[in-house]
Amino acid sequence: MKARQAYERALALINERDSGGAYHTDVADFEKNAPELINSIVTLLWVDECIVRNIAMREINWNFEPIRTLDDEIPLHEALASGVLPFALASFLILEEDSERADYFYRLYTNARSAVVSAFVSAEHGSVRDIY
């Protein structure tokens, strides 16, 4: 997924368009800051990336290529890039102007993160062995 797609989803979540469909004036600042915010979120989601891709954390390259522009690909599984990252980005974008809404989007992010990871984690059913 391109970073711009995640950015557009985040803007839609925080409703940054007026009734005529034009962006509000602070969107230019949002766009300038979005690549670095996305890189920070990718770092937060890197452990989840291992889980989703079923890769041992010791085997993954932790030095991912950071995005530089919104036209770059987000180096995450599609489920994380499209279903989780936009909520965190929405939260970070509006943190200074509306901390209550930012907190709401951060809770949505943590819920989405848990849901995606849970969908990829499988456990075998069986008895628990008493080791005492």
Region spans (language model):
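Residue-level detector of alpha-helix boundaries and kinks
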Residues: D26, E73-I74, I94
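Structural motif
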Residues: E73-S82
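Short helix-capping/linker segments at secondary-structure and domain boundaries
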Residues: F92-A102
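Amphipathic alpha-helical scaffolding segments
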Residues: Y104-N111
